[in-house]
């Protein structure tokens, strides 16, 4: 190129930005054709106005609307000419654009809004004066790699596909070290087409240019667009570097692309457009693995316990651990008396048989316990599917429920215990060993085949007992108290009967004595005695009737008269014997009377 538009080389290549997939936002159409039609597409008889694009091979210019600079504004305007590459320093090309006399460097993504002025905005803020595209194939400094170019202090982004028509710096252009801007297009100086074989991009594409968060907010950099049809990424250039780039600024008119050839769709670099991510294929929701944890396992809840991670936890050795032993624990439950009813046939078995059976059971338990590991060393692995939480284990110290006599024990974990044995620590142990006080009041616990545990009560200290576990007893003292009490009751009853009959007998004797004292003779007996005595004493005749009524009227007098004759009779023999030895006296008189 020449300075001021006098360069003999008019075949300089221009780098035109690709158009987006949607119509321009200002809704304007190009009006670069002469004739009466100021809007719309040209007709065959209309001659084009302004510069024509020429292919790189030196062919003739064409008026095809699909070929040319897209988005350029009016003819002769500095903002309507696409940026021209300038290979001044190295393969990292600087892009310059014509201005009204100033070859200022324009930064992509300038904070100046679209349509704010006719002149390009310089990117001279801070240590960086311009932006230059990074050659393809270089690693991005954002990934921890540095750019091989000189004076590059800011991170750069990857360039798009090089098939976009980026000109080769070795095309015989003038020395780009001059850093002069390209003159504006004139009717006698057409702008050549950099790549006639370049097809227009798909209108469905978009360019997103967000702010990359640099230290200086006035120099935003566009985001990488690795796909074809996108703008090349630019790298910041140091202030002392001669490689510069100029871009046309949008016009303040509502139609900045008027009188432009070809399609006028243009994407302004300063206006970032969000790109919506294509919705992916709807996937079914993932199955969330849920694992339960138990506070007794020493776990710390989800995320820190046994169920965290969804993977099976392993021991330090690396082997997966089985389920925790706490799930196999079945501590004791209260014993039910109705579960066991021994018979007297158990007494026939000797103590030796029971002791031998206990020894055999202990040996079996030791063999089973030999293959088990310590309870504290187990870590239950997390299952892939949710599992039902185990039922809360009963508290320790309570006896386990034992099966009823004659029934087989319920199998646990594909194993079962015989009658009289319970599962403890994943092994079968006898009830007599686990519960030392299974039999009360000094009873002895025995294991009977097919019947379970049996209690033999202490018959030496106690006379009677009751219950399957000797819980009810009767002592000798109790028997003695019952016997003494019964005897006392019988004696008391006999005493009461004796007293009763003795009193009755006493009353009978008293009444009988009274009857004897109050008994008198009858009047007839008294008359007969008085008559005989009176007649004998007085010498009266027994046939004396006048004296009879008088005796009946006075019954008390015969008593006195009776005593007098008795006394006379008792003294008469003595007097007769003394006075008259030969006479018989009163007895003789009685005999004579008789």
Curated annotation (Swiss-Prot):
Segments crossing the lipid bilayer: 482-502
Keywords of this entry: Cell membrane, Developmental protein, Differentiation, Disulfide bond, EGF-like domain, Glycoprotein, Growth regulation, Membrane, Neurogenesis, Proteoglycan, Signal, Transmembrane, Transmembrane helix
Extracellular side: 19-481
Any Pfam family the entry gives: Chon_Sulph_att
Glycosylation sites: 26, 44, 413, 425
Residue numbers spanned by region Disordered: 1-325, 343-418, 535-594
GO annotation, cellular component aspect: intracellular membrane-bounded organelle; plasma membrane; synapse
Subunit-level organization: Binds TNC and TNR. The 80 kDa form but not the 140 kDa form can bind TNC and TNR when expressed at the cell surface.
Protein name as catalogued: Chondroitin sulfate proteoglycan 5
Organism listed in the record: Gallus gallus (Chicken)
